[in-house]
A protein has these predicted regions:
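Residue(s) in the substrate-gating loop at a strand-loop-helix junction
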Residues: 150
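Active-site helix of classical SDR
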Residues: 122, 166, 174
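Alpha-helical segment proximal to the catalytic Tyr-Lys
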Residues: 127, 179-183, 243
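Substrate-binding pocket helix/loop in short-chain dehydrogenase/reductase
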Residues: 98-111, 215
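Conserved NAD(P)H cofactor-binding loop of Rossmann-fold oxidoreductase domains
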Residues: 90-96, 255
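Short C-terminal tail/terminal secondary-structure segment
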Residues: 235, 246-267
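Conserved glycine-rich Rossmann-like NAD(P)H-binding loop of the short-chain dehydrogenase/reductase
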Residues: 30-46
Length: 267
């Protein structure tokens, strides 16, 4: 099937909870070999301990902001499954920024966590994908990289200054890497999401129950999506069904980013 990922090997970061965990579990259920990476070893063990180290799923704990940890993750994946076909950069952090405080370090932290980690891992994995494809015949796909972004990349909320900058940077990285890797038959795409019940959104709604109604009211489809709906978009971009798609940022937000907050006409 064009959308099948059976037999493919994927690295999924941010796999200890939320969207990353949903991607990892669903990919494994649909026949992919999955290396689940996260710095939260305790949570990885709690979520995956019963199935890891057997069958088609493994987990790797480490701080991917460190270059050596990235190299070790790639090596561990090759040791376990021989090849790498798919990378899903789902590791992300949401942090508020004080736009008027020059001592605030959230922008630097979020650029390092949400952008630079994804870039460095993509570079390492792409090198492995290129090496693998050198020994193959034909002009089939060499690999697919999917970055998880946010509609915050195109919205202006001062309290999310750092997160928005990092998300916008991730999308530009996606486009630039898509051009750099296209000659090697590696596709690079992103999914920008909003109005999806991620771990961070669930936590926020728990603290502010009134936000659920506000989100649903201001989302044209009048609901919050399940993580599975986002996973399906990621699988599409990982599969051969999207074989001619690269450099794209797919928006999965129920139409939320299409709305103008001002109802009065502009002219």
């Amino acid at each position: 099937m064009a959308f099948s990922i059976t037999g493919k090997t994927a690295i999924v970061t941010g796999a200890a909870n939320g969207i990353g965990l949903a991607v990892a579990r669903t990919f494994a259920d649909r026949g992919a070999n999955v290396m689940c990476a996260d710095m939260d070893e305790k949570r990885l063990a709690e979520e995956l301990g019963d199935v890891a180290d057997e069958g088609n799923i493994r987990y790797f704990a480490g701080d991917l902001r460190q270059r050596l940890t990235i190299a070790n993750l790639v090596s561990a994946t090759i040791d376990a499954f021989d090849e790498i076909d798919i990378l899903v950069n789902a590791s992300r952090q949401v942090m508020e920024t004080d736009a008027l405080n020059p001592e605030d370090t959230s922008v630097e932290q979020l650029l390092e966590q949400n952008l630079m980690t994804a870039l460095r891992l993509s570079q390492q994995v792409a090198r492995r994908m290129i090496k693998q494809s050198d020994g193959r015949e034909g002009d089939g796909p060499a690999g697919s990289i999917i970055n998880l972004s946010s509609i915050a990349a195109h919205q202006t909320r001062p309290e999310l200054l750092g997160y928005s900058i990092a998300s916008a940077g991730l999308e530009q990285m996606t486009r630039s890497m898509a051009l750099a890797l296209a000659p090697h038959r590696i596709r690079v795409n992103a999914v920008a999401f909003g109005s999806v019940m991620s771990a961070s959104l669930k936590s926020s709604i728990g603290d502010h129950p009134e936000w659920r109604e506000e989100i649903e009211t201001r989302t044209p489809m009048h609901r919050i999506a399940s993580p599975t709906e986002l996973v399906d978009a990621v699988q599409f971009l990982a599969s051969e069904g999207s074989g001619f798609v690269t450099g794209d940022v797919m928006t999965v937000d129920g139409g939320r980013s299409l709305l103008d907050p001002v109802s009065a006409p502009a002219h």
